[in-house]
A protein has these predicted regions:
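Extracellular glycan-interacting surfaces
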Residues: 1-363
Length: 363
């Protein structure tokens, strides 16, 4: 069975289904006119979650128990009333964007990452939230800063499938953080990374690194892939140490990365042009794939737009299904493409969607 595809866009959430001929059609459209920044699917109870950004009216969170046919509003993650600012005279922190959602170890458990860089925890299917103060009060957090946004944010939350209390976080710009005990304690990873946008004497500082996205192989969880602001990296020890990969065609800049769910040597990236243009390199849209652990890369573009293309794929805009062969990419121009052969070829699923922020297979 082909899993539904959740498409978060600037004008709401679309739930798409594919038929046997791989033709995609919209089954549900929710939150029309409202940006949907992130979605989550919990396979244990088949619940969908959607994070919204209402602008003036703030961040909202919704849950669906019927595969997107209807939704109920939940309390969104928020700092406790009276929570102090980082510095006297500064405003108290408040959540401006819900940037990541991930099921936890126990039934009904959820993790949420936000801008500013805060981690929140729920044990009741999102009905209530607790700020993970252990991370917020880490001394190194004061070194974090914004990249594409004014404030830092947590965009990647990767529980270890062997023990989902073990967490790996990606923070832009704040590096990678690991917890062995569901957020009670933290250590910073990232040896081997370099931040070329920093002064030379600070380029190896772990707390100022800018991971654009992290992806973990579920079948071999120590293998983690990283699309960094300053290149593409691989970790073989769960995110503590990293090796920079060379020889990528077009560009080693981009935002999105996906890991094969079973094969630790396969990963996909979507190259772009850094920093000001934020468009496909040389106007050529493609997907970069490695099948040998990053020793070599191939550029895949059959079925994607020819040059000049201006389709940028955001960090949550690349998704892989559990079979490791079905993929989808969505762009800032509202284009959606699907592949059934591991990215070797692509087929246009929809060309008229609003700008796409996130994709996820509900499987």
């Amino acid at each position: 069975m082909i899993p539904p595809l959740l498409v978060g866009t600037r004008k709401g959430l679309f739930v798409l289904d594919a038929d046997a001929a791989d033709r995609w059609a919209i089954r549900h459209h929710a939150f029309a006119g409202v940006p949907v920044t992130i979605t989550a699917f919990d396979p244990r109870d088949r619940t969908l979650y959607a994070g919204l950004n209402h602008g003036h009216f703030g961040v909202k969170l919704h849950r669906s128990d019927d595969q997107g046919a209807s939704w109920i509003e939940l309390p969104a993650p928020a700092f406790p009333t009276g929570f102090p600012p980082d510095e006297e005279g500064k405003p108290a922190p408040s959540v401006s964007l819900l940037w990541s959602l991930e099921p936890g170890a126990e039934p009904g458990e959820l993790w949420a990452g936000t801008i500013p860089g805060a981690l929140f925890h729920s044990t009741d299917r999102g009905s209530s939230w607790r700020l993970v103060e252990s991370l917020w009060h880490e001394d190194a957090r004061r070194l974090w800063f914004g990249g594409g946004y004014d404030a830092p944010g947590i965009h990647s939350i990767l529980p270890d499938p062997r023990d989902r209390r073990h967490l790996l976080l990606g923070v832009s710009c704040g590096g990678v953080w690991l917890s062995p005990d569901a957020g009670a304690h933290w250590e910073i990873g990232g040896a081997g990374l370099v931040a070329t946008y920093m002064p030379e004497q600070r380029q190896e500082d772990l707390a100022v690194q800018d991971p654009h996205r992290l992806a973990r192989c579920a079948g071999a969880p120590d293998r983690v892939w990283r699309q960094h602001h300053s290149g593409v990296f691989r970790s073989d020890d769960g995110g503590r140490n990293w090796v920079r990969l060379e020889g990528l065609p077009l560009s080693d800049f981009g935002f999105a990365v996906a890991a094969h769910p079973d094969d630790p040597d396969i990963a996909w990236f979507v190259p772009a042009e850094s920093d000001e243009n934020r468009a496909p390199s040389n106007g050529r849209m493609g997907v970069t794939r490695t099948r040998d652990g990053g020793r070599s890369f191939e550029l895949l573009g059959d079925g994607l737009p020819p040059p000049p293309a201006f389709d940028l794929v955001y960090r949550h805009g690349l998704a892989v299904a559990p079979d490791g062969r079905r993929l989808a990419i969505g762009s800032t121009t509202g284009g959606l493409w699907a592949s059934v052969d591991g990215g070797g070829s692509w087929r246009l699923a929809d060309a008229r969607l609003p700008p796409i922020a996130s994709l996820q297979f509900a499987a």
